[in-house]
Structure formats: C-alpha cells, structure tokens
Design a protein with these regions (language model features):
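Metal-ion/cofactor- or nucleotide/acyl-coenzyme-handling active-site neighborhoods
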Residues: 1-163
C-alpha cells in the first residue's frame, strides 16, 4: 500500500510511483480523481474507526494504522514510528532543527509542511497522545518495533524477535 495524506506529495512523486504495483490511497477526492487512485474518507477524531472512515490524525502513518485495522489483522507491527523531532525543532519559525523529521530524511522544500503540532523536548506529543487513544481502545494487538520510539503505550520489541 502507498498512502500519502498531502496532495503535494502525489503531485511531486507521481512519475516515480505511478507504475508501482500497490494499492494507492489518499484523503483528497480531487487527488484521487486526478491520478485514478483510491479515495479514503476520514474525519478528525481520536482512536481507530471500524467504519470506512479513518481518523486523519496529523500523519500518513496514523492514517495507515487505521487502514491496516480495517483489514482486521490479528496484530499490527509499527516500524519507523519514532515521533521524535530534533530538540531544536521550531515549527513556528519553520526550522527543522539539527536532524530530519523523517527516517528517510527531510522533504525537499516544495514538500515541507508545517502542520500545527505540539513538540516538547523533541517529542511530537500531539501524535503520541493520539496513539495513546488507540491503545486505550484495545481493538487490536499493536507492537512497536521502532527503536527509540516516543510511543510508549504499546508493547515494544526488536523486529527480529517477532514470530
């Protein structure tokens, strides 16, 4: 599955990803029509939805968690969900800080976005709180296999130790 929650990503990356043999999804109807990909409706709320809707939750990763849940898995494994920004990150000043916000590096300038996020001591606390709401629901087993993750509401382990 390939999911992006901002239309700019699809506009920028479409030539590179259009032929990938993957389910491609977005939360924007216009973008879905433009590229012939699947539109996924959503709303702003905490936790997972068992209806066709997903929770927007400020990130594609959070949205993917809800999309995975719709497939009724026995277990979901998180990889790359650290929720950490550089300690010197300053979203209001549009300053990334001393390290990128994503495992793959920082977006190029045309794709950088500065959502309303609460970052405290380098931790994306707003998203961590949303994951806590998912944990409280207890709808599916979720294991966080992201080394050094700020998400502490799910059991964690090394990916190699999973069976």
């Amino acid at each position: 599955m390939l999911h992006a929650c901002n239309y700019q990503w699809w506009d920028s990356r479409w030539p590179e990803v259009k032929d990938l043999p993957a389910r491609k999804t977005t939360i924007f109807e216009d973008t879905a029509r433009k590229y012939g990909i699947e539109y996924v409706p959503g709303q702003w709320f905490s936790g997972l939805s068992d209806s066709p809707l997903i929770s927007y939750g400020h990130s594609a990763g959070y949205q993917l968690l809800n999309l995975a849940y719709h497939k009724e898995p026995a277990r979901i494994v998180l990889l790359g969900y650290d929720m950490r920004f550089a300690a010197d990150y300053d979203g209001k000043a549009r300053k990334v800080g001393s390290q990128p916000r994503h495992f793959f590096g920082e977006y190029p300038p045309e794709l950088q976005h500065w959502p309303s996020v609460k970052v405290r001591d380098g931790v994306h606390v707003e998203l961590v709180d949303l994951y806590r709401s998912v944990a409280k629901q207890g709808l599916v087993e979720i294991i966080n296999c992201t080394p050094g993750s700020a998400i502490d509401c799910f059991p964690s382990c090394d990916i190699e130790s999973l069976s």
